[in-house]
Amino acid sequence: MSKLIERYSFGKIVDRGEMPHFLEFQINSYEDFLQAGVAPQKRENKGFEAIFNEIFPIESSNGLLKLEYLWYEIHDNDAPLNDELECKKRGKTYSGQLKVRLKLTNKKTQEIQETLVHFGDIPLMTDKATFVINGAERVVVSQLHRSPGITFNKELNIQTGKDVFIGKIIPYKGTWLEFETDKNDILNVKIDRRKKVLLTVFLKAVDFFMTNAEIMNGFFDVKEVELASLYEKYKGDELDEILRIRLEGSFINEDILDEETGEFIAESEELIDNIVIEKIRENKLSSVKIWEVKPEDRIIANSLIHDNTKTNDEAVIEVFRKLRPGDLVTVESARSLVKQMFFNPQRYDLADVGRYKINKRLKQDVPEDVIVLTKEDVLQTIDYVKKLVNGEGFTDDIDNLSNRRVRGVGELLSIQVKGGMLKMSKMVREKMTVQDITTLTPQSLLNTKPLNALILEFFGSGQLSQFMDQSNPLAELTHKRRISALGPGGLSRERAGFEVRDVHNSHYGRICPIETPEGPNIGLIGSLSTYGKVNKYGFIETPFVKIEDGKADFNDIEYLGADEEEGKFIAQADTLIDEDGNF
């Protein structure tokens, strides 16, 4: 008979509690997308529910027809195809039927039709976080991509040798905004990484400020400079020098008139240069009201000096001409373009993660449901770029895991589905216009082929949908926890440089530094570490033990993301600690 053998562990790390569920993120991601087991009225606005709410209602161009979404249901397929093992044997896809309750309102005939429309089949996830597609078991690998939000960085202009400071507002969907300085110390805004406009033109175009005077009030202090005593105290070149130090580079706040002739000595908003100073001295003005430009505000003042637009109408037309050169422009069409670009949630979406990142980086508390650009976002970004120019603040490391997030299968599929639904909605609008509206039904309006083709393509031949490695149970588990920087919306192996592939200190406890393929994909494909978890925003967290007064409390374990561990002293997991928790 064999005796029970006592096992000894020679590892430095003692048992630190239960390991997390290894497939929790993958399963939750798809469950959140489908919300199959949730009653329609209790569903959260995410996944399929969010897509339907965004696409519907669909209205005809004349406003007579309106197709509304009520709810959706997912039904099991008939036996035997409702069983994953049977699907494997028969070479079929393990899926459910997506049925959507729609309401068509005909305002001309006052007729309302409510129907449950079959949208097609949607693959279901097995308990092991896999999909059975045409009899083969497949895994959708999670994607590591650049997080929406805000980043600040510094680049060297090789021609001038000067540092260029850039603040980027990156939305989840929509137009990128880059606030960058140039060789002349002017702050510009680059729209969608292509067209560059002056900061002050942009601020007026988006209606954050109406005029240059409003911009000056927003960024500069109004100050009355007393001059009478200077004329008595200083003379000649010395007086010129003092006036230049006090006034040059600022802006006149109010029109200055010659009381005898009624002529302008200087106009409001005029830059105070040598000529204006000469006029002030000649007329022996007792005081001058100015907008004082401090050294840190010089980049704003330089933008104003080069800005030829006076009102927001002129500014919005200039932005339109930069974005759509050659197109016929009116104030209304230009306003519509800018509004669609930054303030329409269907075109510009920061998502909850983007809003969270912006709030955290700029120390704001804008509600998370505000997913479009706000005046506060832009002004705080400008302030931070000013800080960087003046040697304050810090730039971001784009390879830090606080600036990279994981997209699970649910999020990846929702991007595909949204594309299919948009195509479908365009076809519905065309049918509403062309066909006889008295004979139309929800079924006849909808063509779900583009949607089904995209879903099939995603699971069948998508770059992140892979045939599961089944050589042993460990290989299977590793494949499901794999994270790839490749795929749609990610990096390409040809363009990815050394920095993005390299091991980063923020990977500690989050991504395995060893397990990565050799060859062209090195560093672009990795695996979640044993204790690594993905939080609701998609950032990878790892557990930490709190140390207070030199004592470790293993009952107080906190999961922190890479952004939350900044500014804290961190010791390695294998640091020697005695039985009482002392270092």
Name what the model sees in each region.
Residues 256, 513-514:
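Hydrophobic beta-strand positions
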Residues 515, 526-529:
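Active-site proximal loops enriched in glycine and acidic residues that flank catalytic Cys/His/Asp
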